[in-house]
Amino acid sequence: MNSFNPLENVQKILKKSCEILNLDESVYDLLKEPERTIEINIPVKMDNGKFRIFKGFRSQHCDVMGPYKGGIRFHPTVNGDEVKALSAWMSLKCSATHLPFGGGKGGIIVDVNELSDNELERLSRGYVKELYKYIGDRYDIPAPDVNTNEKIMAWMLDEYIKLTGNNTLATFTGKALGFGGSYGRKEATGVGVAVITRESLKKLGINIRESKIAIQGFGNVGSNTAKHLERMGGNIVSISEYDKEKGVYTIYNEDGFNIADLIAHFEKNNTLFDYKDVKHISIDQFYSLDVDVIIPCALENSIGEEEANKIRAKLIVEGANGPVNYYADSILKDRNIIVIPDILANS
């Protein structure tokens, strides 16, 4: 990942967009910062009986379209500027797709691999204890994001109901079906990215059945994108992921992968590093692959100026939020490489 500040990135994009649309400068002033950002300290009793304090955030960018809406991520790199930027992207996504929501985003600075299941539950409930006055189905509606899932949403909703007496299940989305969740929610983003990829290739005169695709990130979005692209006939030849012990790694198979088998292996082992019959390549080689599409589905700022100059793909589809930074975007435009933006691709 590049060190380019994500808030600075989205502000540059907003500034340029306002200039292109010839909007009054006050529009940019309204959008460049969230309406509020809440920073909290969450005390959690660990399994050893000692307390540990975790830093958390919730950014509420703009509610002109409706209640704030956006995920909560658990990751060691979470910070205030990141959640501010992500909440701005959520405002743009909801507006672009005509959804009656504004933009929100939250997160906790934590490595979930270091916590037991009980500690993770106490942390999730603690986040709600500190923030419950600022959320609700008509005000701010959290959802899953990086390293959070339907189980964590269920814990959070349960805690919210205990604290408020308000049993409206719509306060949190992304829950299990038995707890007020929606059919297809888990796969929805990946399906959308896959459809956008197929249709974009079609515009370029490329049949998806003859395409080669590389995906960065194999979490919920990346794995479901791969699964549905394979069903459409796409050939996934490379996947880049992160392993706590190995760091960033990339697997490659010029003949393509069996995605169902990859998903099963990843769910069982939480890594693809040791997957059978693959070639390991560097992340630099990943960006330089002779493929038709690169789909970044990891974290923001994955593609900077250096990566943009190496890319040989004809198309980049932003499965993650803000994976191509402002400067890289200009380079790709000059090189006639099409970027399908996150506010459309993963909305």
Predicted regions and their residues:
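Short, Gly/Pro- and small/polar-rich lid/capping loops
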Residues: 2-41
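Glycine-rich, N-terminal phosphate-binding loop and its surrounding beta-alpha-beta segment
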Residues: 40-48, 53-112
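General beta-strand structural signal in soluble alpha/beta enzymes
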Residues: 85, 139-143, 167-172, 238-241, ...
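Glycine/serine-rich phosphate-binding loop and adjoining beta1-alpha1 elements at the start
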Residues: 95-209
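Short, surface-exposed connector motifs at secondary-structure boundaries
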Residues: 135-137, 206-210, 289-291, 308-315, ...
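Glycine-rich phosphate/diphosphate-binding loop of Rossmann-like nucleotide-binding domains
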Residues: 176, 181-288
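Rossmann-fold NAD(P)-binding glycine/threonine-rich loop
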Residues: 298-347
